Amino acid sequence: MDMQRKYGRTYHYPFSPGTTSDDRINKEYWQDIQLIKRLIHTEKLDGENNCLNQYGVFARSHATPTVSAWTRQIRQCWQQIKNDLGDIELFGENLYATHSIEYRALEQDFYLFAVRCKDMWLSWEEVKFYAALFDFACVPELPLNTQNQTEAEYRLAIIEQAKEMGCFAPHDVHTGLPCSMEGIVTRNAAEFPVVQFPHQVFKYVRKNHVKTDRHWRVNWQRARMAHEYRQEEGHVVLK
């Protein structure tokens, strides 16, 4: 296994408003989608992409395992499963640190979204299998049926779904007000080769979502779990 292989960059839909100057866009997405039998749409969560494999826990760079403070908990979890991973690489969204969205309904802080084995990205069913095997949750699957749609209908369905709040009560960290989900990630439900990644996975990101990486890292705060918010609300009621 090549320890240096990080997660591929996910190309944006051409109608994704949250692109930045260095983002990549799949202008031929519709042709790619016509070749995919079944799509899965999941909520894009606002966290750090972490990979767990037999060598350690990695953030975006796979040059060396991460030792950041906000990965301490997932690194402790890795210690328990590292000998069972073999060629399996688990990719998930680490929500231990709050970024641009404060989630108020989290039951845990790591959500699996992909599994790689050698030169293949495993199917969504296999992702769910390994999530259950290692006691992780998966990123939320969205109730979005886009089969047999025209391109215009498909585009509208993605845009409208992305306006929803999402599954974990997202709030803007600056205003404290409820906000929409960060975006949507679409993938082929079946397994596919690693080299085909740009043609099998697509994303839609809300406008003006991206904040400076330095901001959340320097002033990072631990994300609170749902039970902590419930306790806080209970204290307010008692007063």
Question: What positions do the PLM features span?
Answer:
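Core nucleotide-handling region used for phosphoryl-transfer chemistry
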Residues: 1-239
